[in-house]
Amino acid sequence: MEKLREELLQANVGTVKENERMASHTTIKIGGPADLFVEPKHIDGLKKTMEIVRKYNVPWRAIGRGSNLLVRDGGIEGVVIKLGEGLDDLYIHDTEVTVGGGYSLIKLATVISKQGLSGLEFAGGIPGTVGGAVYMNAGAHGSDMSRIVKKAQILFEDGTIEWLTNEEMEFSYRTSVLQKKRKGICIAATLEMKKGNHDEIVAAMQKNKDYRRETQPWNYPCAGSIFRNPLPQYAGQLIEQAGLKGYTIGGAKISEQHANFIVNAGGATANDVLELIDYVKKTIYDLYGVSLQTEVEIVGRK
C-alpha cells in the first residue's frame, strides 16, 4: 500500500491520505478508516488514479458526499476515491444539461430551476452528487433520475470511458447497471429537461425542500432512508406502526420524525446502526411478514 501511495503522490492526482476516517466523509458521521483516500483534483487525476489502482490490483470504491452510505467500524480495505471539485463542470444548452459527476445535486436543482427548466424539482433537498444520484437512481416525490437521464458517462475499472444511454443504464428502483453488472464511476451525465414556468418550478422545488425539512431529521447526522419501500407499502409506516420510533441501540436511534431514518444521536458506531437495522428487520417480519431490504449501502470490513 505504501508503494501505491507513493505512486499516487508522484502522479500528482490530487489529495492522497492514509488511514482517513470515513466518519469525516459520510453524512451519518460514522465509519472507520480507509487504507488510502484519494480526492482527484480533475478528471485526468481520476483517470490516473484508476490506472494506478488497477496496476496494484487493490479494491476500490468511489463516493460523493457520503449520503446513503454506512461504513463499518473496521474501515474500508483498499482505496476510496472521492468525487467533488474538479469534476463539477456544468453546461446548459436549451433543455439539455450536461453536468459533472461531482456536482452537488441540490445545487444543480436550484440552478436549473432558476433557468426555467423543469424535471429536477423532486431533488430539492436531496443531498449527494449527480454521480451518486445516477449510480443509485435517486428519487423522491414520485420521480427519479431515470426519468431525466439521457445518457451517462462512465469510467469503468478497466480504464475505458463510455457514454451509456438511459436504456443501457438499466435503471430500476434505487439501482442501476453500475450496481448490478458493471463497476464504474459516473463522471458526467446529460439530462433532458423541459421548459416550464419559472415561478411554478421554483415554488415546486421549495415545497419539496420544505416537506423534507418538516418530515425528515435535520438535527442529527443520518444517511438518508435506511430501507427500500416494499411497495405498495412504505417502510416508514410499517416501522412507525410497530411502535419503533425513538428506539435506540447505543448511539443509533430511529428518528422520531420519520421512522425510515436512523440518526446518529451521539457517538454511534456502525455496529450500533447494524444492530438496530437487524432488530427492525426482525420486528417487521415477525409482525407483518414483510422482509425489509436496506436502501443504504453498507460497506467496509466486517
From Swiss-Prot:
Cross-referenced Pfam families, in alphabetical order? FAD_binding_4 (PF01565), MurB_C (PF02873)
Show the catalytic activity. Answer: UDP-N-acetyl-alpha-D-muramate + NADP(+) = UDP-N-acetyl-3-O-(1-carboxyvinyl)-alpha-D-glucosamine + NADPH + H(+)
Q: Which domain of life is it from?
A: Bacteria
Known EC number(s)? 1.3.1.98
Question: Where is this gene product found?
Answer: Cytoplasm
Gene Ontology CC annotation, any one? cytosol
Enumerate the spans annotated as FAD-binding PCMH-type domain: 30-196
Top enzyme class of this protein? oxidoreductase
Query: Any idea which residues are catalytic in this one?
Result: R174, S225 (proton donor), E295
| rRNA processing listed as a keyword | no
Which PROSITE patterns does this UniProt record tie to the protein?
A: FAD_PCMH (PS51387)
One of the entry's Gene Ontology molecular-function terms is: UDP-N-acetylmuramate dehydrogenase activity
Q: Which UniProt keywords apply?
A: Cell cycle, Cell division, Cell shape, Cell wall biogenesis/degradation, Cytoplasm, FAD, Flavoprotein, NADP, Oxidoreductase, Peptidoglycan synthesis
Instruction: State the similarity comment.
Output: Belongs to the MurB family.
Q: What is this protein called?
A: UDP-N-acetylenolpyruvoylglucosamine reductase
- Source species: Anoxybacillus flavithermus (strain DSM 21510 / WK1)
Gene this chain is encoded by: murB
